[in-house]
Structures are given as structure tokens and as C-alpha cells.
């Protein structure tokens, strides 16, 4: 894996000849660009994303563990990148741009501090690796997208500054009621509302005392949502019926991108052009960063200052997690409306279902996201035999199939 990776010191920063000369639109996290006339804008947008890579010479994980994550931490770094994008949207806004050498905002430094490679940073590699033990992953073991999503959900609980609501949608299903209960926990969904929200409102850390009061007001009635949707979009390869839907996710203004990649080699996908996905690659080993005496963070190595990497969409592993950020309830309602429109796109399949409430008859205990292709096919065959082969299609070439799961019919759970 390492033999094929770029080395930070050898990258040709500022060069853009690698990006295609095409009239096709370039989509990056909900923003559309013209590759012929807006190359500088594309590079600026890509460079402004937080780029988390392998690091070395950091304090041992757990006191006696690894001091580098080279070779095993790529999916953890991708998890940091998708969450880092959520924090940028939360505290700085999607249109914020990083400019090399420009004095940084306090919120930006606060975000970087949350990801430094040390045990007391909210989202450090140390925290993710140790929290992953509870998900059955030993330190140094490779993670899948679903495991990273579950770990990030647990870690955000301790971040009182960002006060995010993280929802991991399982079973290919997004339940709107569950999300609204999570983001507005003081509401009584039996009909009444509490007199006032519980006392979870934050105390800002020292470097962020001047945080905008308006931002607090905006989130007083809605905890900003990070929605992560782990998906399996095929067996060993992505089902081509999902390709257009996956691409259209990058067009949504709420897009946080996609974490996935190839087997045992994770990437953070931030957009697409034509049939190619645009991504940030964590497979570069850099030295761990220590804050300066004035609490500033040397940040050059947290931004990828070269043309973004690209991969044909058919090369992506079918196991992914798609991310979205909804700062307000209106953002979430808008996202729901857009997803419903996407579900009617001709010639493609929706990657997940959007429902008002969880069907009471459905309870799936099988972790399909972590099945190998062989076990996946065996499971499908088992359901086919159990159902007697009547009315339950197992066509994996792109057609939806319905399976009677524990008494309830679900469409596309194993698509």
C-alpha cells in the first residue's frame, strides 16, 4: 500500500496540469465549478479542506502503544476528515477559505486542536483508536466506514463547544422522527414541548470566548446534525445502478462527502467530475504537530496544496459511509426534500430510504456492512430459500429486490 502513495516532500504544490480540461461541471461538497475557467477556485476549495494523513512520532497510544499509524490508520484519518469538514461548516461556514500565512481565526485553531495527535484532543487518533476497542477493534487494526462512524458518534458527546448531534443511520434507512428527536431532545413528540431546553448549552474554551452569539441562538432550538449513513452498494464491486445517485449526493449543499476507497486503503471523497471521483488521500506520513507556545498550530501540513487525486467511480469499494451536515432544522427539511427528488431519478436506484418513522415490524440484527462478499451472497441465498423463492428476487445486477426479513418486507436492504 505504501509503495503507491505520494510523499509530501515531493508533491508539486501550486501545479494544476493534472486536473482535466473539460467542460463537464466539477462538484465539490455541494459547490459547482467550471474546470476551464475556475481552476484557481477549485484548488482553493480543495486546499481549504482539512487533510489528515498518517503521522509519526506522536505519544504512544494508550501509553505503550504505537507511535505512528502508518499502514493501519487511513480509515481513521478519513473519519477525521469528514468530521473536520462538519466542524468547519459548523464554526466557519462552507465558504470559509484557508490562506497560507494568513492569521487564523480562533475557531479554526479550536478545530485543529481537537484533532492533534495526543490523548486529550477530542478527535485525536488516540481517542478514535481507544474508543474503537469498544467496537471490537484492537489498536492498530484496520477499520471499516461503519466502525469509524460509530466511534465518531461516541466521541462527539464530549465536545461541548461544537454540541453536535451525530446520527448513524443503519439498515439503509434514515428515519426523520429519530433525527428530530436527537436534534431537538427537549420536544415532547407526544405533542407538547418542554418549557425550555435542558441545560446543555455550552461553555466555550479559552481561545473562543468571542464566539458569535448569533450562532448560539441558531443552535438553541436545533443541535447541528452530522448524519452518517454507512452503506453497502454491491458485493465486491459497486452496483452501477447506484453510481448516478452517489454522484448526486456531492451536489447537495449539505454534503460532507464520502469515506470509503479500496479494500484496506481508505480515501475521503469530496466530489466528482465526469465519471471520476475527487478525493483526499491520507497515505502520506508526516511528523506529528505540536502547538506553539502561543497556542497556535503549525497548519501547513493539514491542507493538501496540490491538485486533488481522482479515481474512476467504478473502482470504489462498495462499502462506504455518506455524510451530511444540517446546521438548522430548515437545512434538514431541505435535505429531505432533495433526497425525495433524487429517489425518483430515472435509471438509478436510491442508496437508502427516507421514512417518517421506523416500521415497527422491522428488526434486523445482521451486520451486513461488515460481511464479506461470500457471506453476503450466502445470506441472500438463505433468505431466498426461507421465502420459498416466491416473489423475492435476488437479482444483484441492479434491480431492487425484496426480502421477507423477520416478518417484514424491506426493499433494497442488501442492495
Question: Where in the sequence are the language-model features?
Answer:
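Cysteine-dependent deubiquitinase/ubiquitin-like isopeptidase catalytic cores across multiple families
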Residues: 1-68, 85-87, 91-388, 402-415
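Primarily extracytoplasmic ectodomains and periplasmic/lumenal surface modules that are beta-strand-rich
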Residues: 81-83
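Short polybasic linear motifs
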Residues: 388-389, 397
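Intrinsically disordered, low-complexity repeat/linker tracts enriched for polar/charged residues
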Residues: 392-394, 401
Amino acid at each position: 500500500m505504501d509503495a503507491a502513495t505520494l510523499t509530501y516532500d515531493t508533491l508539486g504544490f501550486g501545479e494544476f496540469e493534472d486536473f482535466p480540461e473539460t467542460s463537464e461541471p466539477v462538484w465539490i461538497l455541494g459547490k459547482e465549478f467550471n474546470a476551464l475557467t475556475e481552476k484557481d477556485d477549485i484548488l482553493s476549495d480543495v486546499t481549504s479542506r482539512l487533510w489528515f494523513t498518517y503521522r509519526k512520532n506522536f505519544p504512544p497510544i494508550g501509553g505503550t502503544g504505537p507511535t505512528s499509524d502508518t499502514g493501519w490508520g487511513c480509515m481513521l484519518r478519513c473519519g477525521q476528515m469528514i468530521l473536520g469538514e462538519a466542524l468547519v461548516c459548523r464554526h466557519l461556514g462552507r465558504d470559509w477559505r484557508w490562506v497560507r500565512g494568513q492569521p487564523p481565526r480562533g475557531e479554526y485553531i479550536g478545530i485543529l486542536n481537537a484533532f492533534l495527535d495526543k490523548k486529550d484532543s477530542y478527535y485525536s487518533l488516540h481517542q478514535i483508536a481507544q474508543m474503537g476497542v469498544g467496537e471490537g477493534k484492537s489498536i492498530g487494526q484496520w477499520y471499516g466506514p461503519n466502525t469509524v462512524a460509530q466511534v465518531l458518534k461516541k466521541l462527539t458527546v464530549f465536545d461541548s463547544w461544537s454540541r453536535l448531534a451525530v446520527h448513524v443511520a443503519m439498515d439503509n434507512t434514515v428515519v426523520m422522527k429519530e433525527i428530530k428527536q436527537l436534534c431537538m431532545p427537549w420536544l415532547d413528540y407526544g405533542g407538547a414541548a418542554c418549557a425550555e431546553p435542558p441545560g446543555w448549552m455550552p461553555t466555550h474554551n479559552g481561545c473562543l470566548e468571542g464566539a458569535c452569539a448569533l450562532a448560539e441562538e441558531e443552535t438553541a432550538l436545533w443541535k447541528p446534525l452530522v448524519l452518517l449513513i454507512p452503506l453497502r452498494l454491491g458485493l465486491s464491486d459497486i452496483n452501477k445502478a447506484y453510481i448516478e445517485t452517489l454522484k448526486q449526493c456531492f451536489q447537495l449543499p449539505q454534503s460532507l462527502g464520502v469515506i470509503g476507497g479500496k479494500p484496506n486503503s481508505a480515501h475521503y471523497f469530496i466530489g466528482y467530475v465526469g465519471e471520476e471521483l475527487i478525493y483526499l488521500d491520507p497515505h502520506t506520513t508526516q511528523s506529528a504537530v505540536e502547538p506553539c507556545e502561543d497556542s497556535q498550530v503549525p497548519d501547513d501540513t493539514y491542507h493538501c496544496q496540490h491538485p486533488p487525486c481522482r479515481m474512476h467511480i467504478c473502482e470504489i469499494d462498495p462499502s462506504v459511509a455518506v455524510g451530511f451536515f444540517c446546521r438548522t432544522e430548515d437545512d434538514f427539511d431541505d435535505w429531505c426534500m432533495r433526497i425525495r427528488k433524487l429517489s425518483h431519478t430515472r435509471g438509478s436506484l436510491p442508496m437508502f430510504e427516507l421514512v417518517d418513522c421506523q416500521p415497527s415490524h422491522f428488526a434486523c440484527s445482521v451486520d451486513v456492512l461488515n460481511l464479506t462478499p461470500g457471506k453476503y451472497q450466502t445470506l441472500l441465498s438463505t433468505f431466498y430459500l426461507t421465502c420459498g423463492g416466491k416473489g423475492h428476487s435476488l437479482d444483484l445486477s441492479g434491480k431492487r429486490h425484496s426480502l421477507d426479513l423477520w416478518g417484514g418486507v424491506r426493499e433494497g436492504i442488501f442492495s
